[in-house]
C-alpha cells in the first residue's frame, strides 16, 4: 500500500495510456508528503484534457473514508467521469464484502443522486478483472 510516488504512464496496446497516480490517502509517509501527493493528483486530474475515465481505488475493508468522499465530490463538481474499484476483496467473506459495498453506496447516496459504477476486485483471485477490463473497453469506444 502507498507505494506509488510518481505519476506512471503505461502504454497499452500502442493505443492508450493507463496512468497510475500516487495515493492521496493512506501512505507510509509524512503528512507533508501526503499533502504534496494530493496536490499532484488534483492538478493532474483537473488539467488532463485527454482523460477518458478515472478509477478511485478504495480498500473494501475500510469504512468509507472522508478523503475518498471529498475526492469523489471534487470529481463530480468538475465533471470528471469516474468509477470506484473496491480492492482487497479476498480479505473479506462474501457477506462482509456486500455489507462494505452497501455502506459505501449509502455514504455516496448522501451526495449523489445517481451513484457511480462500482467494481469489487482482488488481485489475488482476479476477482472483477473481466468486468473492469470490459468497462475500460466501453470507455475507450466512446
PLM regions: where:
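Switch I (effector-binding) loop of TRAFAC-class P-loop GTPase G-domains
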Residues: 1-14
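Amphipathic alpha-helical transducer elements in NTP-driven molecular machines
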Residues: 4, 34-38, 69, 126-129
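Switch II (G3) loop of P-loop NTPases
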Residues: 15-39, 59-62
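Conserved nucleotide-binding/hydrolysis micro-motifs of P-loop NTPases
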Residues: 16, 23-25, 61-63, 88-93, ...
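Conserved ATPase-coupling elements of RecA-like P-loop NTPase cores
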Residues: 27-32, 63-69, 94-98
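Inter-motif core of Ras-like GTPase G domains
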Residues: 33-61, 73-85
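Canonical P-loop GTPase G-domain recognition
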Residues: 91-142
Amino acid at each position: 500500500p502507498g507505494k506509488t510516488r510518481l505519476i506512471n504512464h503505461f502504454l497499452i496496446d500502442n493505443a492508450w495510456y493507463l496512468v497510475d497516480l500516487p495515493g492521496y490517502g493512506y501512505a507510509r509517509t509524512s503528512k507533508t508528503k501526503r499533502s504534496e501527493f494530493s496536490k499532484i493528483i488534483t492538478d493532474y486530474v483537473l488539467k488532463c484534457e485527454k482523460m477518458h475515465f478515472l478509477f478511485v481505488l478504495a480498500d473494501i475493508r475500510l469504512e468509507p473514508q472522508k478523503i475518498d468522499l471529498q475526492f469523489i465530490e471534487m470529481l463530480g463538481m468538475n465533471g470528471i467521469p469516474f468509477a470506484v474499484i473496491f480492492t482487497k476483496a479476498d480479505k473479506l467473506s462474501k457477506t462482509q464484502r456486500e455489507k462494505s459495498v452497501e455502506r459505501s453506496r449509502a455514504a455516496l447516496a448522501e451526495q449523489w443522486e445517481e451513484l457511480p459504477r462500482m467494481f469489487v476486485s482482488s488481485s489475488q483471485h482476479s476477482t472483477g478483472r473481466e468486468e473492469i477490463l470490459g468497462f475500460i473497453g466501453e470507455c475507450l469506444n466512446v
